[in-house]
């Protein structure tokens, strides 16, 4: 089972996701049944915040004085069956803006999955690793939204 510790850092999130803890509980239950994640006991924290705090975090940890959609802070890349993976932070304003012509939830899922994969060691520094990460994101998103 995969568990998320959800930290609601900005009130606007509840306009789109009424109960973030239940939302992640349901999504992660489904993700835990995805073949790659079966029999894994992973835990991570996710901060649902705003542009102001994201800009501050981005500067503090990456020395970039601008906001961003998602930041991931892996705890370790040595995974055991039971592992704390690390922390993710996501900006409400960026997700909301990108979702302007589509679904907020689908855009949010895309971004937190991207952050989650960073916790698992995926990156997009080179074309090959970018494609590998993008393929895994798409596999998970398709699994989430497949018709039963």
Regions found by a protein language model. Name each.
Residues 1-112, 117-148:
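An acidic/histidine-cluster motif and surrounding catalytic segment
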């Amino acid at each position: 089972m995969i568990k998320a510790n959800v930290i609601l850092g900005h009130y606007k999130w509840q306009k789109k996701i009424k109960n973030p803890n239940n939302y992640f509980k349901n999504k992660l239950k489904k993700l835990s049944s995805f073949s790659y994640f079966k029999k894994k006991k992973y835990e991570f924290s996710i901060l649902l915040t705003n542009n102001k705090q994201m800009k501050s975090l981005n500067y503090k940890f990456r020395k970039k004085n601008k906001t961003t959609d998602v930041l991931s802070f892996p705890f370790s890349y040595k995974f055991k069956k039971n592992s704390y993976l690390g922390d993710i932070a996501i900006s409400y304003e960026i997700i909301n803006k990108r979702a302007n012509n589509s679904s907020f939830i689908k855009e949010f899922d895309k971004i937190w999955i991207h952050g989650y994969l960073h916790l698992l060691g995926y990156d997009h520094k080179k074309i090959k690793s970018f494609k590998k990460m993008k393929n895994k994101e798409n596999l998970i998103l398709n699994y989430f939204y497949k018709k039963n």
